[in-house]
Amino acid sequence: MDYLLKTEPSTYSFADLEREKATIWDGVSNPVALKNLARMKTGERLVIYHTGDEKRAVGTATVVSVDASDERNPQVKIKAGRPLTKPVTLADAKASDVFSESPLVRQGRLSVVPLNERQYRFLTGE
């Protein structure tokens, strides 16, 4: 499974991740988002999405390691991938049938969103 990780760029942006190369993804409090974090597996692909005024997918990353021994605070280390050649906006996703049943458009406050292969390809252009 692939995932989309939402972040407020003024707090932590994709550029920050690129500069640091890797980070522990934290600051998640929603119970569903925490469960999604805990389900992640090493090597899974991620899309980084900027919230706030941007509302767009901006880059890729990969899960490096997962420690879900504490389900209330899973520790997921991710490493930066590449910036997207063409960032995809929330409006683009909503206009596509690819996301009609996705939490990305149905649960706007969910910060860790599972993606199927088709959704991942739509966002990344791969």
Features from the language model and the residues they span:
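Surface-exposed flexible segments
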Residues: 15-19, 62, 92-96
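Hydrophobic beta-strand signal
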Residues: 47-48, 62
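A generic structural signal for short beta-strands and their flanking turns/coil linkers
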Residues: 1, 21, 42-44, 57-59, ...
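Contiguous surface segments at macromolecular interaction interfaces
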Residues: 1-11, 29, 68-126
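Hydrophobic/aromatic beta-strand segments within beta-rich folds
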Residues: 43-47, 112
